[in-house]
């Protein structure tokens, strides 16, 4: 068994996806030093990439307005490389919406593209910068209309 990364400071990692062409890995990473207000949950996770022993955040997170373009306002999970390995799709839950009302924190799908880095001017101790520009590609609504294309929860890819 080869260990490519070991989490520290009480963080958890999981759901590893391997790059289709090189020895590169992307996976879910939970928060370091979790506490009663910030713990391993959908809207507190991030994507992390490991390549040649170098570790970097895939996505940036900015939960303080004004928000940074290309950064997420919550957690990414279930990361999957595109067939050519250039982009990464992921599922997403929004911390800001969860704080307003958990019923508004609807799962979406996003794409991380290699147009970074995305540098966050950290105004909250849990904010961080990332290597990729992220954008959501799904649209959800809390109350989808029957017979419409509206959804209240998006899934992988």
Give residue spans per PLM region:
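Sequence signature of WD/YWTD-type beta-propeller architectures
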Residues: 1-157
């Amino acid at each position: 068994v080869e260990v490519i990364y070991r989490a520290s400071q009480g963080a958890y990692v999981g759901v590893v996806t391997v790059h289709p062409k090189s020895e590169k890995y992307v996976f879910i990473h939970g928060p370091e030093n979790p506490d009663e207000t910030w713990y391993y949950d959908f809207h507190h996770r991030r994507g992390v990439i490991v390549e040649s022993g170098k570790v970097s955040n895939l996505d940036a997170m900015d939960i303080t307005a004004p928000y940074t373009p290309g950064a997420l306002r919550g957690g990414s999970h279930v990361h999957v490389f595109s067939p050519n390995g250039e982009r990464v799709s992921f599922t997403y839950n929004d911390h800001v919406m969860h704080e307003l009302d958990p019923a508004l924190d609807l799962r979406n799908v996003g794409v991380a593209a290699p147009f970074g880095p995305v540098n966050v001017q950290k105004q909250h101790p849990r904010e961080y910068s990332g290597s990729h520009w992220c954008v959501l590609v799904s649209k959800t609504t809390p109350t989808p209309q029957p017979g419409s294309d509206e959804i209240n929860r998006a899934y992988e890819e």
